[in-house]
Structures are given as C-alpha cells and as structure tokens.
Amino acid sequence: MKFNNKRSGGYSASLAAQLFDSSKPIHSLSLDLEPQMKFEDGKRTDEVQAYKAWFTQAGLPPFEVKFETKVALPAYLSVVEFDNIEACEVSYNVYFRAVDLKEVN
C-alpha cells in the first residue's frame, strides 16, 4: 500500500488507525499463510521468520499483514478484526503487522 505523508519511526498503532476506516469491515483474501523466510548473510535459510496474509477494506487497495506466529485464517472474504495491528511507513510504502486476528460474525 502506498501512502503520501512522510513519517519517521517504526511500527505504530496510531498510523494503522489513521489508514483504516473503523466503520467499514476488513475482509480476508488469503486462503493460506505465506511463510517469510529468514535470511543470513544475504542467503535464505530454511527458518520461517513470519507469516503473511492478504486483506482488503472498501476504499483501500489490498494489503498484506505480517504475523510472527502461525494464525488460523478464516474462509475467503470473511470479515476479520486484528489484535494489535500496527503500521510502518518506509519510502512511502506502508507495511502492517499484527499479533493475531479473529473472524467477526
């Protein structure tokens, strides 16, 4: 996801709150988690560092969220809420991470 305001610092819950519209649902797009492998000395290892999945909200482009542990993904297009979602801007790109997610009925 691209963002047009330059900020400094690392991950922030307030930046995530600015980007999402709390009145609109967030839908899960991924069927499976994508493992993010660890790299050492520029070489890929067999160790999984994190897991990523794709989501969408009306008015925003699809976005990827990183989880440090394996989470249970709900069915395609299920409405979800994140546990401790944070965002980080790097060179006008925004990256997200969360502790967990849950399906909202």
Describe each region flagged by the PLM.
Residues M1-N105:
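OB-fold and OB-like single-stranded nucleic-acid-recognition modules
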